[in-house]
Amino acid sequence: MLLVIDVGNSNIVLGIYDGDSLVRDWRVSTDKSKTTDEYGILVHELFRLAGIDFSRITDIIISSVVPTLTGVLEKLSLQYFDFKPYVVGPGIKTGMSIHYDNPKEVGADRIVNAVAGYEKHHTALIIVDFGTATTFDYVNKRGEYCGGAIAPGLMISMEALFQKASKLPRVEITKPPAIVAKNTVNSMQAGIFYGYVGLVDGIVTRMKGEGKENPKVIATGGLAGLIAPESTTIEEVDEYLTLEGLRILYQRNRES
C-alpha cells in the first residue's frame, strides 16, 4: 500500500492507495509546532481506527508547501516505517515541462495537480485549487505547465475583513440567503461569497482568452464544492485530484 501526504498551510491530507484505488483518506489541521513523534502518534491512531497495520505501507510520497514540516514527515517515514519517502521537488520526475521563469518557485501542490489533471483529461486545463491561497494553473494541450495566478484564499479574505474592520464580526463562510442582505452577517457573507465567485470567473475567463485553447476548468480543494455550483466557468470538481497526482508521480518515479 502507498501512503500519500499533501501538506498545505491549513490542512494536511493523507490517503492510502491499494494499487490505483484510494481506500482511505483523512484531513487534519496543519500544526507547525508538532514534532515527528506527535505526528507519528497521530498517524498511528488514524491507522488504528481504520484497522490498517503500519506494516502494510510499502512506500510514502509527500507534497509539502510548509518547508518546516517536510523534514518532520521525512523523519516520520524513516522512524516509523523504516524507509525514505519520495518528496515532490527537485529530483522528482514529473513527466511535464514547466514553463516558469524559475521552475523551483512553483508550489509542489500546483505541479501535482497539473500532472493529475492532464493524466486524467489529456486536454488543455485550468485547475483552480481552493486552499489557504487559491491557485489558478494552466496546462496546455501538449501537457506543458504554463503558469498561472495566485489569489488570497476565502479564509484569508474573511479574516482580513474581520481583523481590519473593528465593528465586523467573524462569520461562517457560506452562501447567504440573498446577495441583497438584510443584516451584517449576511452582508459579509454575500460580499465574500459572491465576490469570490466573481474573482474565480473573472480570472478563469481572462486565462481562457489568453490561452485560446478552450481549456477544461476543474476545481479542487476544501472549498471547491461551495464555490463551484455558483461559478459559470468551473466544469468539474475533483476532490481527490492532489492525492491522485501524488499516486501518479510515485508510479512514474518508482518505475524509472
UniProtKB/Swiss-Prot annotation:
Subunit structure: Homodimer.
Gene3D superfamilies with a match to the protein in the record: 3.30.420.40
Keyword Kinase tagged: yes
Catalytic activity: (R)-pantothenate + ATP = (R)-4'-phosphopantothenate + ADP + H(+)
Name of the protein this chain belongs to: Type III pantothenate kinase
Pfam family, one: Pan_kinase
EC number assigned by the record: 2.7.1.33
Taxonomy, superkingdom: Bacteria
Protein task: Catalyzes the phosphorylation of pantothenate (Pan), the first step in CoA biosynthesis.
Classification lineage: Bacteria, Pseudomonadati, Thermodesulfobacteriota, Desulfuromonadia, Geobacterales
